[in-house]
Amino acid sequence: MSLFDDTAVSKQLAQVRIVMVNTTLPANIGSALRAMKTMGLSKLVLVSPKTYPHPDIQALAAGAQDLLEQVEIVETLEEAIKDCHLVFGTSARSRTIPWPLLDVRPASKEAIKAAAQGQQIAIVFGREDRGLTNEELALANYHLTIPVNSDYGVLNIAQAIQVVCYELRMSVLEQKEVASDAGQMPLAQGQSMQWDEPLVTQQQMEEFYPHLEKMLTEIEFLDPENPRLLPLRLRRLFGRIQLDRMEYHLLRGIFSRVQALTSGKWKKASSDKEDQSNA
């Protein structure tokens, strides 16, 4: 039995969505829904599932029919996370470029801390046989891993979702317990930082990166024929920072000014005055 109001816990967890990419087995979808319902999560997004709908989904989602009715189906991962501010991509393997990597427990704490600040969060799970592609993982701010037995580190997707959902719930309960204790202290601890601008969404960042790469190409810093790992490293950099709206528009304004200067479409005011005096 929970010591806290389940309605309040579920309200915070409602800002966290579970995303399953190209899931093959309908049973995994049904089991994932039941795992989510047990821990108080409610939003599941399926990216191009191989088989949907299917009787096995209903059978395995026993008791979670309300969640099943709310499942969202989309064609791409970009669409699934477009309004999210913070994205975690699950990964069991090291990649070409090291990415900010968190075990499930600290990752859950970060997710719940962000949710408490009004952010939308996505936890993305890949295919049963090969997980997420490098391109899909590059859309995440952080990679998330579950520290399993190195001799037999095998979890199916539904089991992994159960572990993650449990850790998310425990993070909410722990946060509420800390807040309750802090209220009795002279100086409350663990308070969230109040920011003056909202963070940008993943959809906005997907407009940001092409602009950045176009500007870098125009100043001949990026070779589009041989970009090497530069675009990926830039994604890692800005994904780690999490831009707010003001920073986003500031940087895009700088990119546009650099492009204008490079193309000769913009001149400094002093140059304009000098031209006028010589006329």
List PLM regions with ranges.
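Post-transcriptional modification and biogenesis factors for structured RNAs
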Residues: M1-A279
